[in-house]
Amino acid sequence: MAADITLLFKASVKTVKTRNKALGLMETTGREEPGAQKRPRPRQRDSFSCKAREVISNISKLKDFLLQHRKDYVNAGSVMSSEVSRMTDSERDQIDQDAQIFMRTCAEAISQLRSEMDKKQVSMQVKDHRAAVLDLIDSYLKGVCKLYSEQRAVRVKRVVDKKRLSRLEPEQINTEKRQSDGEENDKPVSDGNVDLWEENRVEDDLSPEEIQMFEQENQRLVGEMNSLLDEVRQIEGKVVEISRLQEIFSEKVLQQETEIDSIHQLVVGATENVKEGNEDIREAIKNNAGFRVWILFFLVMCSFSLLFLDWYDS
């Protein structure tokens, strides 16, 4: 039975719409309902809250989807569970791909909301409130990412355990076969002669060399089992370490996205300041040139005045 990922698909579509709205790629069309046109001002005024609620709703849908399909998802390759998983490996891989894209899209939507918050001219109290809201949403997304990482780590661990334990199946089959052969050989003949049964029993007794050989084989099997158990424990520790590193990596990626956005804002501000400085320099050069022209004009007029007075006196 195929897993139902309709909720994840709808949540992904809503997240993409939210990101497009934040980027300004979607415009309101004239096909809106009459009831929606009566309140355009509150929507325009409270667009941040609407987008934040939509992002939270999408993250909650992802969390519900992961918890709903957790049992079928983590049963991949489980050899200890007696239940049959209703989810195939391809469906699990598709869930991994969609969940990663979904979480990346949510992180981009949060980053876009942060950039919009920095661009808008609002009071300091409103800006602090929106920053706190975005921090809470970011923490919520990190919690869902941690939940997904833990589920994926459990799935990988069970797949590795199955591959390790599958190597013991041929040896177990041979051991069971030898045990069944031994039981058949040890069954006494109920209707035979007592002397013949005694002779067969003596022939079935193992020699010391055979007993020593079986003991060595048993010791070898025990050693292999212990080594496999140690390898499984090491792999389990490595899987847990990989899960922890993946969680740290996701947190660092989100922090780097926030830092990149802040650096982008600083670069944009520095560019604007450089443009304003160039304009001021041009204006100063223009004013300085005009001042020189007026001084030259004043000197020329003074010279002509002195020449006129000298001519007039003579």
Swiss-Prot record:
GO terms for molecular function: SNAP receptor activity. The chain crosses the membrane at residues 289-309. InterPro entries: Syntaxin-18_N (IPR019529), Syntaxin/epimorphin_CS (IPR006012). Residues 222-284 form the t-SNARE coiled-coil homology domain. Residues 24-48, 170-196 are annotated as: Disordered. Gene3D superfamilies: 1.20.5.110. It is a single-pass type IV membrane protein. Residues 1-288 are cytoplasmic. Pfam families: Syntaxin-18_N (PF10496). Its main location: endoplasmic reticulum. Residues 310-314 are lumenal. Keywords: Coiled coil, Endoplasmic reticulum, ER-Golgi transport, Membrane, Protein transport, Transmembrane, Transmembrane helix, Transport. Belongs to the syntaxin family. This is Syntaxin-18. It comes from Danio rerio. The gene is stx18.
